[in-house]
Amino acid sequence: MAHSVLDSMDPSSSIRVEHDRKRRQFSVRLNGCHDRAVLLYEYVGKKTVDLQHTEVPDAFRGRGIAKHLAKAAMDFVVEEDLKAHLTCWYIQKYVKENPLPQYLERLQP
C-alpha cells in the first residue's frame, strides 16, 4: 500500500503554499508532484481580487490544507493592499472563523 507524504505528517508540520501569480493560484503539492490542492483567484478590478474556488483532492481532505491556502490568499490580499470578494464558500468560512481586522477591512460585498 502506497503512503503519501502527508500520511506521515503530524498536524503541526508546515505545509508549503506556492503562489503562482501568472496562473492566479495558490497551491500545495501533495503526494510528490502529481496531486495538488489549489485556490484560484481573478482580478476583477485594478486593486480587487475575487477568491473564487478552493479544491483539495478527496484523499487529502480534513487535514487543514484548505486552511493554509485560505490564509495564504488572505495574507496576499493584506500584503498587496487589495480588496477581496469572496466567491468561494470555504474562504468565507475561513474569514468568519478568523475575523482578523486586517482581513475584514478588505472585504467587498
UniProtKB/Swiss-Prot annotation:
Signal peptide: none annotated. SUPFAM superfamilies: Acyl-CoA N-acyltransferases (Nat). Residues 18-108 form the N-acetyltransferase domain. PROSITE patterns: GNAT_YJDJ (PS51729). Gene3D superfamilies: 3.40.630.30. InterPro entries: Acyl_CoA_acyltransferase, Gcn5-rel_NAT, GNAT_YJDJ. Belongs to the NATD1 family. This is Protein NATD1. It comes from Xenopus tropicalis (Western clawed frog). The gene is natd1.
